[in-house]
Every structure is written in structure tokens, then in C-alpha cells.
Amino acid sequence: MHRPDSSPKTSERPRLGLALGSGAARGWAHVGVLRALDEWGVEVDVYAGCSVGALIGAARLLDIWDPFLDWARSLSAIDAMATFGISLSRGGVVNPDKAFTRFAEHDKPIEELPKPFAAVATDLATGHEVWLDRGSALNACRASSSVPMILQAARYQVGYTEHWLIDGGASNPVPVNLARALGAERVISVDLNTVTLALSRFNRPNTTAVIPAPDPDEGLTGPFAPLAKAFGGAKRDLVRRMALARAKSQAQPQLFETAAATIDIIQGQLAQARAYIDVADVRLTPDLSCASAAAFDHHEEFERIGYETAQAQKQEILAVAGLAPDISKSDDE
């Protein structure tokens, strides 16, 4: 375990840790939270992350924050798949190695980062959580974000043996305990999974997806418009049949959305359970109930939600950061 920062404090404020949870594209909410902290002058001393939370924390400490955000903002769901690379033969649909080489030149050993940092992953052989606090920062993020079925498991050297590691969300989606082990005296956690609705289109019983057929005449302009309109009846029938076929296929959960929803449900339940065991001083739970974990092109919305969630708990955050009186304690007294 990376030794806690033993450098003398420059003030009487407590050493503040940030536990950034898993959530794939919903990780943009972390960016909104960090933007709020920066605006208020809140200094984070310790970063502990799971999956996308680990990547966000590493990007801050590797000094690639702005280029990382610019790159990530350019991604759509399709772009993300292309960036990572498809590989069906090695234990996952996506091979993430290609994406992680993008910032390889900026990678550093975790021991050389300016502040304590660690990522949490899950040992595929034992099911235990593993704290990655040494070696390549990007390799730690790669292991921490290896979502089962989606991203290939990561082979990682732990001590003197190699282990196959998968997403930390399978064991500890919001690593509050890791932040404290790294030396944090106060911890702010950001949980992206507790308030999620995995498949919102199935949230009412006895309903199926309804896909309205588009207007068959829409976009029929130019010299071929009269001919197209003459065959309007046949075209309407074709459009209607296509819409019905699509609705029928989506009236039941599809393979990958079922896998993603299952992961969301398990991580959400696990995050709630662990929140009672590893208690954060401030727990932020952005309402991402309508957010897909693959909605990379919704970064502005997710970032806004994270920012607004932090704003709603501003006084609590400032208090634990030592920048304002602790209202809860004064009330108790």
C-alpha cells in the first residue's frame, strides 16, 4: 500500500480524500463535481477511484486533464467502440489497450504522482478487491475499468504473482475505505450507481417499446417528389412494416443492454450496502436515473448533473474541507 502522505500540513485543515465511483460514461458527473470543487478552492489531497473514477483521478494527477477532457468530449458511443477496438476472441467484446496507449507518453508510476492515488480492481480468481497503488497509473486504470463481458480482463502483476483483474465495481464501486487507507482524514464520495434506472423503457409493467413510424413523405423534395408521392401507399406500408419490426425486436431486452443493466443493478446494490460500512463524510449521489452507461455523447448533461449535485451540498463540502464551520457539529452542540 502506498504510504499516506506524511508531509507537514500547511494549515489546520484536514487531509481531504475523494472517492470516485464507477459508471462508464456517467463518469462525466465526476467532472462536474471537480469543477465545483475547483471553483470553491477545495483542494483534494488523496484520490481513490474505481473504473472511470480511477481514470478521472489519474488524469488529474498525470497533468493531462485538459487534453483528456477534449478527447473524451469528442467521443460518441460508436467512436468509443472504434477507439477501443473490437475483439471477440479474447474474453471481451472490446480491447481497451488501444485507447490507453493514447496517453501512454504521459504515464507515470503511481509512486511518482504528486498526490496519493490508487485504483480498485477485482481479482477474478478470488473475488476480492485489489488496491493498485504502485506501478503504471494507466495500467492500474486499465485493470480497474475491465467491465465483465465488455472489456477484456487485465493481466496484472500483484506482488510476485500475476492475477487476472476485472472492474473494481464488482467488489467496491465507491472506494471510501481506500481513500482513508491512503491517508485521508475526511472523504467525499461520488456514487454514480445508487440513483440509476437500468432500463427505463421497462420500468412499467405490461408495456413495450413503442416506436412511431416516421412520416413517409418527409424529405421528398426535388424532381422525383411527384414519382415518390405516386408510390406513397407502398412506401407507407414499407415504413410501417419496418417500424413494427423494430418495435417487436425492442419489446424485449437485448443482449448487451441486459448485460449492462445487470452490471448497473449489482453495482448499485453493492454501493448502497458498502455506504453503510465505509461511511463517507459527504456522500454525493447524482441523479443519473435516465443515463445510459454508454451515452458518451451526453457529457454536457452528466457534467451539469454532477455540478448541481455538488452545489446542493456545498456547505457540507466546505465544512469537511475545512473552509467553513461544520454546521452539523454546531447544531449537535
What are these regions (language model features)?
Residues 1-50, 58-333:
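Patatin-like phospholipase
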